[in-house]
Swiss-Prot record:
PANTHER family: BETA-DEFENSIN 1, BETA-DEFENSIN-RELATED. This is Beta-defensin 1. Belongs to the beta-defensin family. Has bactericidal activity. May act as a ligand for C-C chemokine receptor CCR6. Positively regulates the sperm motility and bactericidal activity in a CCR6-dependent manner. Binds to CCR6 and triggers Ca2+ mobilization in the sperm which is important for its motility. It comes from the Eukaryota. Residues 1-21 form the signal peptide. One of its GO terms (cellular component) is extracellular space.
């Protein structure tokens, strides 16, 4: 009986984490914006882009800029 309560508690914790929006099933097949930036030859910066580079997108869920 104690084992079933432990399993139920674990399942509830897992489902509550998944309800936050960024769960495992919606994340399948999606790459992070940081990965896409670096793969395309850019770099993620929190400050302004250096001279002779342009903003190509965002990184870290919109908190930084992808400079290329």
């Amino acid at each position: 009986m104690r084992t079933s309560y432990l399993l139920l508690f674990t399942l509830c914790l897992l489902l509550s984490e998944m309800a936050s929006g960024d769960n495992f099933l919606t994340g399948l097949g999606h790459r992070s914006d940081h990965y896409n930036c670096v793969r395309s030859g850019g770099q993620c910066l929190y400050s302004a882009c250096p001279i002779y580079t342009k903003i190509q997108g965002t990184c870290y869920q919109g908190k930084a800029k992808c400079c290329k």
